[in-house]
From Swiss-Prot:
Name of the featured protein: Putative serine/threonine-protein kinase/receptor R826
Species name: Acanthamoeba polyphaga mimivirus (APMV)
All residue ranges annotated as the Protein kinase domain in the record: 786-1049, 1399-1651
GO biological process, one term: intracellular signal transduction
Taxonomic placement: Viruses, Varidnaviria, Bamfordvirae, Nucleocytoviricota, Megaviricetes
Signal peptide feature range: 1-23
A GO term for molecular function: protein serine/threonine kinase activity
InterPro entries recorded: A/G_cyclase, Kinase-like_dom_sf, Nucleotide_cyclase, PBP_domain, Prot_kinase_dom, Protein_kinase_ATP_BS, Ser-Thr/Tyr_kinase_cat_dom, Ser/Thr_kinase_AS
């Protein structure tokens, strides 16, 4: 079947504007290209959108002929083959290779036991020539002896295509010409066309289409067929393909190794900048014989109004060359990245593209190769240049230098001694060698008994050699003991030494074998200098690693191991020294330890050419010098040369670069005066076309910068006051000094008078301005300039709202403390805001403005669209966050914190809620500063601001006198790192007091399970645990954290990274292209969390503004399609609605059972949907997801029908609870034959077919389908019975005629809300044919309910024929649907569910443990509305809230607050209760005049006790856990009611969002985190008794920890002397330390009643 040429695959990315700036239309790039590249560009574009959302990139896949016709409007074109050079020159084109791919031979031979037949080149050529026609030909049998007997005597039917010469069809023909001379001759005679050859002429070869997909489908549907296709298209499909013998005679299969081998075979041609070659039939031993490279081409001379578009296109190309993560992603789709040297040459070609006569690409990409070093991961990442990116690839030092010969790298790094004379050839005569750093190479060991020791093991040369030669195999060997002191010897274990050997060519191998060869003739004779040594070890004495970075990781993970390794690699392995460097004992007995000092001495010896073998002056004997090798005069552009010069200078003279080097254990080379002089002279002579390139070149003189007597500014020396000359090399003469003195003597007095006058005028002006209207800073604004929108969050210091300021979306933090804001507090607030507005850093939230006048004090910040890191981690719509992205998040957060600390600001409240993410997933630190202001406000109301315990360092919890807040921030960061890898809430289930006690007393931290340790990089775990170490001095600084995370980002044991980029990270969010697909595959979610920081992008299908849409003719139906990566369907789709009927009645019947049933139903729907290839649309804002209704999208009608049928059948088999089945709506029903046709939830299903509009949610990375098609499907569902499937005529028409079950026409129906009547069909499931709907049943069917058989008259319903047309006599279908069922998600009809629009919100009257409390009205009744702080509640937890509200609604007691109902729609989830006019007991007692009488106090306490007793009377008891005066409410008649009970889960989660209160009322068993019962409420009541008695606050003046420890140590509030003894005795019993000694609340009521006999009990 030939692919219709009119069908075009379109991939479109529509990028939303940054939220903090005005919305702008970004550049639009349109490229057309081959169909084989659709998936490749889909991955490129969707992942690039996460990096750059200011550009829209469109890729249209089409035939080659259509590509050629499209070149006049396309910005670029993608072909499967290179355009010949002659056409490139003639048309002014430039092309870039993209990826390597494989063409495979696909076949369909039924009955074979093997999926991979074997073919050779000649046999394949003879098949296509027509000389081999049968599958059982002897040549094919000989190649496949295992299946020879299975090969059929059937003709091989060939599927070919004769597309344009830039297609894979042409590549296939050219490859066959190389494979077989027979084919080449026949092909020439046929005019170079498959279609003119014998197989086509004789009818057993047909044109199977240009696209690989078409040929694959043809092969699958054609027995005994054979064709060819690109492997990327074949790989995910179930089709057999052949392995081949290549040109070298080796059997190979298509994969990254064999294709990259083929590319490498032509590498020398590529390095000459010839990208027009084919790579099929490569000669390499491992090369796949039909390999190919696809290309992207464009004009080299753009002429257009806006050249930004050209730059954006080139940036996109550079990105997919440079970004490591996208390279890993495309490998999964069988696209194979180019060799790094080829990428470098291709990138250099970008600078040949011009726009309007100017070079389009100004950004410089420096591509470097060299030995894998941690410093070359950290330096490029830290060197932040907006115009330059450094990309560093690991290689051998010799390879890095060799690549300089062909300009295949911009520079190389070598750690071997560099012999410049060796390379002074015609190709490298201008070689420059700049020494950058030096480091120790050490004998490293991992002996657990030595961890934490201040002393190190000592080894001599002979012992080290004997270890490597297998002569010393035990750590307790006498040769080791002889070099160490008695203490060390006492610790030496009787354990086998495991030697770690790098079984791959490496510089370190060569260096240490050379070193030992110089020290020992025995080693030299046995092994000798080599970069791949071969040792003769017993198997249990060695561990091999083939990773160039693997020795370090192996050492740290292998106890009792040993190896030579660079010291920086050891430092970066772990915070605690698990792997340590041994000291060396020289031949004279001198012991030398590897330190900075011994490294410095060794460098000095090396520079002064001292033979270290003969000199023992305390220098470390084995070091390596890291040198940068480059072309001094012939780099390929001035810009590249200048960028490299800047980088070299930065590494040697920047403080940050030096700090990184020092942290990792490197010696910056320019510390040494000789190297300093050499490096500066190299920079001075570094030129391009005789122009100096360094920005300090003109300041360099005699190996100094400005003679060390001035500074270099803009390449000019600014001399000290006593120096002059071009380089400050001259001292100023005395005469000059005298003249200056005379001039100064005259000028200064005059200048002084003028300055005085100016100062007086300025002071007067300032005084005038202050007097009239005060000082106005640039950032000071009037509050009325802000337009406030939805509330985003609530904290201890106020609310955060989304808003608009001067047309820009912003976040506005309202400061709302008590009204006692003093002038000093106001001034402190203004002073601190002034400092914060000066801070600018990409990882710190931008402070934009502030209003500092009470009562409308606020801060205006940039709006962070994705909300907090905490929300992201809790968002189960994003079920998988790649570890690499987690590391990057941590790295960006640490950068922000390092900046703050460097600016003199400590955070003091660092937590995941205060790390915000913008729309591009960049992390920024927020809620810092205002330290003085917060302190002032806390002093006003200390109980309200007790802190966020989970992230608080122990020294702060214990209120140490001298706290280093920088290191306490590091502690908090450690908790955040734990959150990142677990996505859990720290200390979940523990009270704040329990957390504090456990952290301080027991050194308790969040649990890191063994499984987690095995899944997460040990370097990450080590860094995390060091951050939260109890001893602050052990904790790293944020600079060290940055460095260690930077190295971790590269997955290196020794150095942490194989390649790096200053602008492009290894994990540029790209794996989130998979998050969207995986999110819909979760069949067991806890639910769905949505973020109130929300943006929605919308697009129409079929338009050029589609977001990553791919339109194709791939709507092929499989009976039961199983997918692991489900793309969202586009184009015309089937919309399926499922809905639970009578859900409200079931929730009213038993909320607990209905919650569990709904969770089972949700899991079942999602599981079957995934198996059938469906996509779950985000639900509309009118209803929550998971409450009974689903909107599912299918691209194929048959898959949709399969889903419907499977769902209805499997619902009957669910293990529903017996309690649920008691209800008539969910009871079991059987047909007359005893077959169960109903059980449990009744679900109705409606279907419609058509186009939709799609909204994209960037937070969940999912799509919402809307529009008339969706509305119609929903409307059809509302008139459908439970258990019934109804579809529109559009669906019925698309249903395959081969389907065994035919839909039954119900006629034309009018549906409310749908303008036109619809012809509807019912789909009848044969297994459930006995179901009865609306008085009509199918032929020969009836049902039995409640085990009793009831006969029904047979009805004539002819299902034998099917027609999608309306019958001639159309009749009206009247569905007998009750009014309350004409509503989807009927769970919303519960009596206690309130429409939020019916609530009128009033003033805020309080802030509870899980919500902000407002006064309001509902249906003209005064109510209190508690709006949940946490609105991002996942699906299952929201069902739990629904269950709890249903239960609480049934509670009725005069001393329990009455639950009116709840609104359950985000973002307005709230509960509504009766309104209590006098507020809470605490406030009432404070404001009560006159003071309460004894009788009143007893009455209040009795009523409180009655309320608690009522809660405890349930089985199991309802435990309040938070009894205190602020949760006891009073009405105008002093009636007491208990509030704030229930919702334990929500309270727990909100404990991290609001600052916890003091633990005055908390029972000791809760603080100890012990098991507790309802007696904890009795304890709290005892404290309340004391408060009511004294009208005072308990533990007044004590801090959080003091109160906590007092409670644990049985210290209680002091009882007044005039307190009645019986009352005091009851209090003591209530607050007894042992819960078993406390009375019940019923006992309490009886005792209290004795004090006032007139009170009824």
């Amino acid at each position: 079947m030939r692919l219709n040429s009119q069908i075009v695959f379109c991939i479109v990315v529509v990028i939303s504007c940054l939220s903090m700036i005005e919305c702008k239309m970004g550049s639009r790039i349109y490229c057309s290209g081959s169909l084989s590249s659709v998936e490749l560009f889909s991955q490129y574009i969707s992942n690039y959108a996460l990096r750059n959302d200011d550009v829209t990139i469109i890729y249209a896949g089409m035939s080659v002929d259509e590509i050629n016709a499209d070149v006049y409007i396309a910005d670029c074109s993608a072909y499967d083959r290179a355009i010949p050079q002659i056409y490139m020159i003639s048309y002014g084109l430039i092309q870039f290779p993209i990826v390597g791919q494989a063409i495979v031979i696909i076949y369909n031979v039924p009955g074979l036991s093997s999926h991979n037949m074997i073919i050779d080149r000649e046999t394949l050529g003879r098949i296509w020539t027509g000389n081999i026609r049968k599958w059982n030909d002897i040549q094919i049998q000989n190649l496949n002896p295992d299946i020879a007997s299975q090969l059929p005597n059937e003709t091989i039917t060939l599927g070919y295509n004769d597309a344009y010469y830039l297609s894979i069809s042409e590549i296939m023909q050219l490859a066959l010409r190389n494979f077989s001379e027979e084919f080449a001759n026949a092909h020439t005679i046929a005019g170079g066309k498959f279609g003119n050859m014998i197989p086509a002429k004789q009818g057993y070869a047909i044109d199977a289409g240009e696209a690989s997909e078409s040929r694959i489908d043809w092969v699958k549907n054609t027995p005994f067929s054979l064709s060819f296709a690109d492997f990327a298209t074949v790989y995910p499909r179930n089709v057999s393909y052949m392995h081949m013998y290549n040109k070298a005679g080796k059997l190979v299969e298509p994969n990254i190794t064999t294709v990259q081998s083929a590319m490498a075979d032509f590498k020398e041609i590529y390095t000459t900048n010839d990208f027009t070659i084919d790579i099929f039939d490569a000669s390499g031993e491992n090369s796949w014989p039909i390999s190919w490279v696809n290309y992207i081409s464009m004009t080299s001379t753009f002429q257009q109004a806006d050249c930004i578009r050209t730059k954006e296109l080139l940036d996109f190309i550079a990105w997919f060359y440079m970004n490591n993560e996208i390279a890993e992603i495309i490998k999964e789709y069988q696209y194979y990245p180019l060799d790094n040297t080829i990428k470098k040459i291709a990138i250099d070609n970008m600078y040949n593209v011009t726009c309007n006569g100017k070079v389009s690409q100004e950004h410089q990409y420096l591509i470097a190769f060299g030995s894998p070093l941690s410093i070359m991961a950290s330096w490029p990442n830290t060197w932040a240049s907006s115009m330059t990116t450094v990309k560093y690839y690991a290689s051998l030092s010799d390879q890095a230098i060799e690549l300089q010969k062909t300009f295949s790298g911009d520079f190389g790094i070598t750690i071997k001694d560099f012999d410049k004379n060796k390379y002074l050839s015609s190709t490298m005569e201008d070689i420059g060698v700049s020494h950058l750093a030096a480091f120790n190479i050490v004998p490293a060991y991992n002996i657990p008994e030595f961890i934490g020791l201040n002393e190190t093991l000592v080894l001599n040369y002979e012992t080290i050699v004997d270890i490597y030669l297998g002569l010393v195999t035990n750590w307790n060997d006498s040769s080791i003991r002889n070099s160490n002191n008695p203490y060390i010897n006492s610790l030496l274990p009787n354990k086998t030494i495991t030697v770690v050997v790098q079984k791959v060519e490496s510089d370190v191998n060569e260096l240490f074998t050379n070193f030992l060869s110089c020290k020992s003739d025995k080693f030299n004779n046995a092994i000798g200098p080599t970069n791949l040594p071969e040792f003769d070890f017993v198997s249990n004495n060695v561990v091999y690693t083939e990773d160039v970075y693997g020795v370090g990781n192996t050492l740290v993970s292998t106890d009792y191991s040993f190896a030579f390794w660079p010291e920086p690699g050891i430092r970066l392995l772990s915070h605690m020294a698990i792997v340590q460097a041994a000291s060396i004992q020289t031949s004279t007995g001198t012991i030398i330890k590897p330190t900075n000092e011994t490294l410095s001495k060794a460098v000095d010896n090396k520079i002064n050419s001292i033979n270290r073998r003969d000199i023992e002056d305390g220098s470390w004997p084995f070091i390596a010098m890291m040198s940068l090798v480059y072309h001094q005069k012939t780099m390929q552009s001035f810009s590249k040369a200048s960028a490299l010069a800047d980088f070299i200078y930065w590494t040697q003279f920047d403080d940050t670069a030096a700090s990184i080097a020092d942290t990792q254990g490197y010696y910056v080379a320019s510390i040494h005066p000789t190297i300093l002089r050499e490096n500066l002279e190299l920079l001075q002579s570094f030129t391009f076309e005789d122009r100096t390139v360094s920005k300090v070149a003109n300041c360099i003189f005699e190996g100094t910068i400005c003679y060390n007597k001035g500074t270099c500014n803009n390449n000019v020396c600014l001399c000290n006051i006593d120096r002059e000359g071009q380089f400050c090399e001259l001292e100023k003469t005395q005469s000059d000094t005298n003249i200056v003195t005379i001039i100064l003597a005259v000028v200064i007095p005059i200048a002084f008078i003028i300055v005085c006058i100016i100062c007086i005028l300025v002071v007067a002006l300032i005084f005038s301005l202050r007097f009239r209207k005060g000082i106005s800073d640039d950032w000071e604004i009037d509050f009325h300039e802000l337009e406030l929108g939805e509330q985003l969050g609530t904290g201890a210091f106020g609310e955060v709202h989304k808003g608009t300021w001067r047309g820009t979306e912003v976040a506005v933090k309202m400061i709302s403390p008590d009204k006692t804001i003093t002038k000093d507090i106001e001034r402190n607030f203004k002073d601190e805001v002034r400092v914060m507005t000066t801070l600018r850093h990409p990882n710190v939230v931008l402070f934009m403005a502030a209003s500092t006048k009470p009562p409308k004090m606020c801060i205006v910040m940039e709006f962070m669209a994705l909300g907090s890191l905490h929300d992201l981690l809790k968002n189960e719509l994003i079920p998988d966050i790649p570890f690499a992205l987690k590391v990057k998040i941590a790295y960006q957060a640490s950068k922000g914190m390092h900046f703050l600390h460097s600016s003199g600001i400590t955070h003091r409240d660092l937590k995941s809620l205060n790390l915000l993410l913008d729309i591009k997933w960049n992390v920024k630190v927020s809620d810092f500063g205002l330290t003085k202001f917060k302190s002032d406000v806390k002093s006003i109301n200390p109980e309200k601001f007790a802190g966020t315990i989970q992230w608080t360092a122990p020294e702060i919890l214990s209120e140490d006198r001298e706290v280093d807040y920088i290191l306490s921030d590091v502690y908090s960061f450690g908790i955040i790192m734990w959150e990142l890898i677990t996505r859990d809430q720290p200390y979940f289930g523990m009270s704040p007091a329990a957390i504090a006690v456990s952290v301080i007393r027991d050194n308790y931290r969040p649990v890191i399970s063994d499984q987690l340790r095995s899944e997460v990089a040990p370097e990450y775990i080590e860094l995390l645990t060091s951050c939260w170490h109890f001893d602050p001095t052990i904790r790293p600084t944020f600079l060290e954290i940055m460095t260690r995370l930077s190295n971790l980002m590269g997955d290196s044991g020794m150095t942490g990274m194989s390649s790096s980029s200053s602008n492009s990270s290894k994990f540029d969010y790209n794996s989130f292209g998979k998050v969207q697909q995986f999110a819909i595959n979760r069949t067991d979610p806890d639910g769905i969390v949505q973020n109130s920081y929300n943006r929605t992008d919308s697009y129409d299908l079929g338009s050029n503004n589609s977001h990553s849409s791919i339109t194709s003719d791939t709507n092929k139906s499989n009976k039961y399609l199983r997918q692991t990566n489900i793309q969202h369907p586009t184009g015309e789709v089937v919309v399926v609605f499922t809905d639970i009927i009578s859900a409200a009645q079931l929730w009213e019947f038993d909320a607990s059972e209905m919650k569990n049933a709904t969770i089972l139903y949700n899991k079942l729907v999602r599981s079957i949907c995934n198996e059938c290839g469906g996509y779950e649309s985000l639900i509309s804002k009118e209803r929550n997801s998971g409450e009974g209704s689903f909107c599912l999208i299918f691209s194929d009608v048959q898959n949709a029908i399969t889903f419907c049928e499977e769902l209805q059948k499997q619902l009957v088999g669910v293990n529903w609870s017996p309690k649920l089945l008691e209800h008539p709506i969910t009871a079991i029903e059987k047909d007359i034959n005893g077959t169960i046709i109903y059980a449990g939830l009744r679900v109705r299903i409606g279907l419609h077919f058509g186009s939709t509009k799609i909204n994209y949610d960037p937070i969940s990375r999912k799509y919402e389908y809307i529009g008339p098609t969706v509305t119609t499907a929903a409307a059809v569902t509302t008139i459908t019975h439970g258990g019934q499937i109804i579809m529109t005529e559009d669906v019925a028409n698309k249903l395959s005629t081969e389907n065994s079950n035919k839909p039954v026409c119900l006629g034309r129906v009018d549906i409310d809300g749908i303008p036109d009547s619809l012809v509807l069909y019912e789909y009848v499931i044969s297994a459930l044919i006995g179901r009865f709907f609306g008085g009509v049943t199918r032929k020969n069917a009836s049902f039995v309910s409640n085990e009793t058989s009831t006969d029904y008259d047979d009805m004539d319903t002819d299902n034998s024929t099917f027609s999608a047309r309306v019958p001639h006599q159309a009749y009206q279908y009247h569905a007998a649907i009750e009014n309350n069922e004409r509503y989807l998600t009927s769970a919303g009809l519960c009596s206690w569910v309130i429409n939020y629009d019916e609530i009128k919100m009033g003033e805020q009257i309080g802030l509870g443990s899980y919500g902000v409390v407002y006064r309001g009205k509902w249906k003209n009744v005064d109510v209190a509305i508690k709006k949940f702080i946490k609105q991002k509640i996942d699906e299952n937890h929201l069902l739990g809230i629904r269950e709890e509200i249903a239960f609480l609604k049934k509670l009725h007691h005069p001393n329990i607050i009455t639950m009116v109902g709840a609104s359950l729609k985000k973002p307005n989830i709230c509960i509504v209760t009766e309104y209590m006019a006098k507020g809470n007991l605490r406030d009432a007692m404070r404001t009560c005049t006159p003071k309460l009488e004894w009788h009143q106090k007893i009455k209040i306490l009795v009523n409180i006790a009655k309320g608690i007793s009522y809660l405890h009377s349930f089985d199991p008891p309802i435990i309040h856990r938070d009894i205190k005066p602020s949760n006891i409410l009073i009405d105008e008649n002093w009636n007491v009611k208990i509030a704030d009970f229930g919702f334990a889960r929500i309270k727990e989660e909100n404990a991290i969002m609001t600052r916890c209160g003091t633990p005055c009322w908390t029972a000791p068993e809760i603080i100890r985190n012990d098991i507790y019962d309802e007696k904890v409420d009795v304890f709290s009541f005892g404290i309340v008794m004391w408060e009511v008695l004294t009208c005072k606050e308990p533990f007044i003046g004590a801090n959080f920890m003091k109160i906590t420890m007092d409670i644990l140590e049985d210290v209680r509030p002091k009882i007044p002397q005039d307190c009645p003894e019986e009352f005091a005795k009851l209090m003591r019993k209530c607050w007894h330390a042992k819960s078993t000694k406390r009375p019940t609340m019923d006992d309490v009521i009886i005792v209290l009643a004795k004090f006032c006999p007139d009170i009824s009990v």
